[in-house]
Amino acid sequence: ELCEKASKTWSGNCGNTGHCDNQCKSWEGAAHGACHVRNGKHMCFCYFNC
């Protein structure tokens, strides 16, 4: 099971899921990452093992 958390290292709009994924994995130790729209903003979310 994966738990979603907003990225702590990403700033600004998330327009590149691949970049978000790489940053979550390499900088935050996440399983993977992806861009999602929340409250009208494109944000990078990281997914961690719960």
From Swiss-Prot:
SMART domains in alphabetical order: Knot1 (SM00505)
Compartmental location: Secreted
InterPro entries: Scorpion_toxin-like, Scorpion_toxin-like_sf
Pfam families: Gamma-thionin
Record-level GO cellular component terms: extracellular region
Uses in biotechnology: DmAMP1 expression in heterologous plants such as rice or papaya may provide a broad-spectrum disease resistance.
Keyword entries, A-Z: Antimicrobial, Disulfide bond, Fungicide, Plant defense, Secreted
Protein name as it appears in the record: Defensin-like protein 1
